[in-house]
Amino acid sequence: QYALDVVAGVIIAGEYVRLACQRHLDDLEKAKAAPYKYYFDVEKSEEIINFAEELTIAEGDEQENVTAYPFQCFILGSLNGWRTKEKGHRRFRTSYVQLGRQNGKSFINGILACYYGNFDGYKYGKIFCTATKQDQANIVFDEIVKFINSDEDLSEWFKVHEHNHTIDCLCTHSEIKALSGDTKSLDGHRAYLGIV
């Protein structure tokens, strides 16, 4: 719905957002043809959005569940919903999401890290939250920790090691780690998800 509203001008958005929404709608049409190699898996899209909305916002007077805004649903749903027809792998291996200050970049990245860390079935993955300085890398890491610590059920699936900025994902044996600009610490690692 978000893509339709943006293209129709109901939701005001910048040029690149309009183009992304138009591509999404065009690709939905192309996916109906046999030679097109991608399809949109509505269930996979809804799975990550539903996961996000089960998370708890720890900040504030009262804890409450996440309510994803339409643009956040579009981002999460597109990343997880578009798949290859041949093997069902995710279509997008990289994405660039640009948001203004205080518009939830770390929040969205925290959702992605929690979901891909333990709940999409990939085993022994490495998820890195990276930045030039450790304090910056810790912003997303801390968001993930807040999600985990504010939900008793979720905390059973993760083990947080704050002293070395690492989270063990107990279901998949994956690891989430905050790293700073020391590129040597990334040598030899294949990231399943890299957050920069």
Protein language model regions, located:
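Phosphate/NTP-binding elements of NTP-utilizing enzymes
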Residues: Q1-V196
